[in-house]
Design a protein with these regions (language model features):
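Amphipathic alpha-helical and helix-coil boundary elements used as assembly
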Residues: 1-216
Length: 216
């Protein structure tokens, strides 16, 4: 919408490729992207892929594989599941501050955004000591509301990096930009720090697949 993404007065592309230029603009406004494989129209049709831009993952479909279960892969199972589960936590700042001079309104713009991520007792204490602060170029944002939205987008980027999971699965129909529920860990180690206390325990949560690679 025009309120969420105001029209840019000027865009400068310098010493960067077209994809790098577009990704820089998307990243600034909190727009994520991914590539989705489309169903083949016929067995002889060439593969088709769609570039997907999004600012919310709430509308993505469920994964074709359905609910997944973790196990060690040491025994024969009746279905394809997750055999490797590796949660990754990253310490991120507790506050983002952005300021800029708005020459159109002849006033300074300033906004801050605190984190909603929970990184454990020690992690939260360290996070409160970390600040992502920057003075942006003049007229960085279209308005005060846009300035706050851009600041919030930067904090949401940090929150996304707080917790992720790398893994392996024997399921052959996992698809990027879909989500699935993870049922049991069945002895697999790993607790996932994340946004809100509900993600402290890995079991029974929904996860979005952002990257899928195939081997073999």
């Amino acid at each position: 919408s025009p309120d969420r993404y105001p029209q840019r007065e000027m865009s400068i592309q310098w010493n960067e490729s077209d994809p790098a230029f577009l990704m820089r603009l998307w990243r600034k406004h909190g727009i994520a992207w991914g590539v989705r494989a489309e169903a083949d129209a016929s067995p002889t049709a060439p593969p088709r892929h769609t570039l997907v831009l999004f600012d919310s993952a709430s509308q993505f479909p469920a994964n074709p594989a359905g609910r997944l279960r973790c196990h060690t892969g040491t025994s024969v199972q009746g279905r394809d599941d997750i055999t490797l589960w590796s949660p990754v936590g990253q310490l991120t700042p507790g506050l983002v501050e952005r300021s800029a001079w708005d020459y159109k309104r002849q006033q300074a713009q300033w906004a801050d955004a605190p984190t909603a991520a929970r990184q454990g007792d020690e992690g939260d204490a360290l996070s409160r000591a970390l600040l992502d602060a920057r003075i942006e170029p003049p007229h960085w944002a279209d308005s005060g509301a846009d300035h706050h939205q851009l600041t919030l987008a930067r904090m949401q980027h940090h929150e996304m990096n707080t917790a992720s999971v790398a893994g392996a699965s024997s399921a052959r129909d996992l698809a990027c930009l879909t989500w699935a529920s993870i049922d049991e860990r069945a002895g697999l180690p790993g607790r996932l720090p994340g946004v809100g206390s509900g993600l402290a325990d890995v079991a029974g949560n929904d996860f979005l697949f952002t990257q899928v690679s195939h081997w073999g």
